[in-house]
Amino acid sequence: MNQTGKLFGVGVGPGDPELMTLKAVRLIRECDIVFVPGKVPEETVAYQIAVQAVPEICGKKLVGIHMPMTKNQELLRKSHEEAVATTAGYLEAGCNCVFLTLGDPCIYSTYIYVHKQLSKQGYRTEIVSGIPSFLAVSAKLNEGLVEGAQMLHVIPATYQVEEGMDLPGTKVFMKSGKALGKVKAAIQKADLDGKMIERCGMPGEQIYNSVEQFPDEAGYYSLVIAKEKEGM
């Protein structure tokens, strides 16, 4: 019996293809199958980042993995099961596979659901880190994220804005787009400094250096950093 293939969850970073790791590039070149989160692989952001760093990906077999953006737990469960079954089929055939994900696979990633199930089933899996969006945003703003004994909190803006504002230290609000009005109001109420980048490292990048500049709504790839004002 042939040995099953191995699955690599590969972070392609936040948007700038030059921020992809050497390991990510090598694995994409060497793999048999590339899984991409989306119905049409070539149209996904993850693929569009990767193809700039690894043009050879065009010659790979691409498999779209559809995972809907929904809070409906039944729909999510079904999509996860389908993704696991699809991925396992290629692993059983002995294919070494890469599953692309934006940023880092460990942070709010669609990949991690597949990873956990396949690992439990005994398949060989490996997570390959990528640069997370909040680190890229902090670097693009040309400033540090935390210093000394400051705490760092990463918060999904679509769920827990109010609870997050009560936490001490620097607050990162991910996926802020549709919740931006709520995030903006919460930052102003708490009298914090807020900055945001939309589409960091991608075409159409927009930088907002103060909370007053924030629109009431932005695109999906919008990330907000809120800090205590200097001198407080």
Describe every region a protein language model picked out.
Residues 1-17, 22-24, 29-123, 209-215, ...:
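Class I S-adenosyl-L-methionine
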Residues 14-17, 40-41, 158-160, 175-179:
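Short beta->alpha connector loops
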Residues 41-43, 132-135, 202-204:
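Short gly/pro/ser/thr-enriched loop/turn and capping motifs at secondary-structure boundaries
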Residues 7, 165-232:
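A contiguous loop/helix-start segment that scaffolds small-molecule binding in enzyme catalytic cores
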Residues 106-167, 215, 229-232:
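Class I SAM-dependent methyltransferase SAM-binding "motif I" and its flanking Rossmann-like core
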Residues 36, 61-66, 127, 147, ...:
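Structural signal for conserved beta-strand scaffold positions within catalytic alpha/beta enzyme cores
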Residues 74-77, 110-111, 138-140, 164-166, ...:
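Short, well-ordered secondary-structure micro-motifs
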Residues 67-73, 160-162, 202-204:
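A short acidic, often aromatic-flanked loop/helix-cap motif at beta-alpha or helix-coil junctions
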